[in-house]
Regions:
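Canonical positions in the second alpha-helix
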Residues: 39-42, 87, 129-130, 169, ...
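TPR/TPR-like alpha-solenoid helical repeat scaffolds
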Residues: 178-193, 218-234
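Hydrophobic/aromatic packing residues within the alpha-helices of TPR/SEL1-like helical repeat arrays
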Residues: 36-39, 77, 84, 127, ...
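Bacterial N-terminal signal peptides
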Residues: 1-10
Length: 234
């Protein structure tokens, strides 16, 4: 029965990962939200389950901020911060927690730009610690990339350096990237950074890569890539 129980649990987790992935492919954020609400309501979640939920909340908060749903973003952000605190207190996968801490400090800056001078350095420190403690931690490199990408050059940001961090993360994630929304999100961010630094050929190649990994990725297939090719056609 224990084996059966373990199998069921694994299937449940695989189910949510697939549900979130399909929601990302089709921009179905209602399903994404329903999934995280159902997971949040579960009692006695394992640390692993909390971490999985944290990743989906991370995606949802980022989407809320990007779509100017600030009050909703704040609600989920506060919930995630409590989750990070619990997992840190349990000493669970600390490098991952440091990467999420960095990301959530970035989200707080996204919600209130005036906090940047105070929270920006903390976000950078957390990301640096995250990769110092685990050099295979792709999420840590993504945060280093995001910090360089979003920080104005005047304050030390650099899109070229962001690309190096994103590429590092991409190399780490590529072997297990299929079926993972985080990998597709990284490819979009990398393509965007290449386009903004005028490296059109590389941007094109990364967009194509995302569609070879996920031909049904509607955001890239129907919006981003057609707009990109139209803008840069010879």
């Amino acid at each position: 029965t224990l084996l059966l129980f373990t199998l069921c649990c694994t299937l449940v987790t695989a189910g949510e990962k697939e549900t979130i992935y399909q929601a990302y492919l089709t921009n179905d954020m209602d399903t994404w939200k329903t999934t995280i609400e159902a997971m949040h309501a579960e009692v006695d979640k394992s640390h692993e389950r909390e971490l999985e939920l944290l990743n989906y909340e991370y995606g949802y908060v980022g989407w809320c901020i990007g779509n100017n749903r600030k009050s909703e973003a704040k609600r989920y952000l506060e919930r995630s911060l409590e989750r990070i605190d619990r997992l840190k207190a349990a000493n669970y996968r600390i490098p991952q927690m440091q990467a999420y801490e960095s990301a959530y400090l970035g989200f707080q800056i996204g919600l209130a730009r005036l906090k940047a001078p105070r929270l920006g350095p903390k976000s950078l420190d957390a990301a640096k610690q995250s990769v110092a403690n685990d050099d295979q931690n792709a999420l840590g490199y993504i945060q280093l990339g995001n910090i360089d990408y979003f920080m104005p050059p005047l304050f030390g940001g650099s899109k070229e350096r962001a690309i190096e961090h994103y590429r590092h993360a991409e190399r780490l994630m590529a072997p297990t990237g299929k079926g993972d929304w985080n990998y597709l999100a990284l490819l979009v961010q990398l393509a965007t950074a290449y386009e903004e630094t005028k490296n059109i050929a590389m941007a094109d190649s990364i967009y194509r890569k995302s569609l070879s990994v996920a031909p049904g990725f509607s955001w890239v297939r129907d919006e981003l890539y057609p707009a990109f090719t139209k803008k840069h056609q010879p």
